[in-house]
Amino acid sequence: MSDTAATLTQDRQKLEMAALSAPAVAFTVAMIAFPVVYTIWLGFQTFSSTGKQSFAGLANYSKLISDVEFWHGLWVTIALFVLSLVLQLVFGVWLALVLFHAKRLPGIVRSLFISPFMMPPVVAGMMWLVILDPSLGAANYILQAFGLPPSDWLASPTWVIPTVALIDSWQWTPYVALIVLGGLQSLPPSVYEAAQIDGASPFKTFQRITLPLLLPTIVTAAILRSVDLLRFFDIIYITTQGGPGNASNTLNIYGFRVGFEFFDIGYASALMLTLTAIVFGAVLAFNRLRGAVAW
């Protein structure tokens, strides 16, 4: 009898917990589901100049195939994604190793190493606009001090993508470093003791032990950064707005301009849903890779 009463009490407590959490869960689901469903619906609509909308079927998606700006935006998005991700993973691992081995480094210095990613992207973009100013910026001043010619970093079609990638890498490499540092601190010390007894050099230890054991952590960092990099918007909009011309016009910037400058909401929704599919594809690919390298 007592067991039955205890079971009934537990069931009642579970029902009470479910009832109390239901409004918050419903609100969260609605806040996520409504924009997604509404955007999908908009992707099948077309809007006239007077604001009248009508069902367009797959017209917005078929337009993507012949849209030169879409393919250019896709290329720019992939170029920025690959360049930024490689820079952030390479230098993030290096910075994590520095912080891991420099245990006597003062706390204030460690904080300075990781401070950039705590800065709002808009502030970071404005700061780099000043630094890279062709007339008064510190970057060209340093180049000229070494006898090198100045460069118009953000106005050059050749340099704008590497420059934006460097700005984003400056901000988010410390974030990758913190993730990798957590992975380093969780590695079993016994394997390093065995390597030291065997006389392995630091490079061999990193190559044969540290890097293989860190691969799942590095892939996790790649997943987190991939989602942001494929949706890259804020720093580009602050520094170049997709220019010069369309040299840094990513899919996100292009979709924003189509929707809010040309007011083609249906086509902009189709662009954003296509970008969302690309993001999901990248995440799934990296998840498979993480499963393959897990230990």
List each model region and its residues:
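Short, Lys/Arg-rich, polar N-terminal cytosolic tail immediately upstream
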Residues: 1-12
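A structural signal for multi-pass alpha-helical bundles of membrane permease subunits
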Residues: 13-295
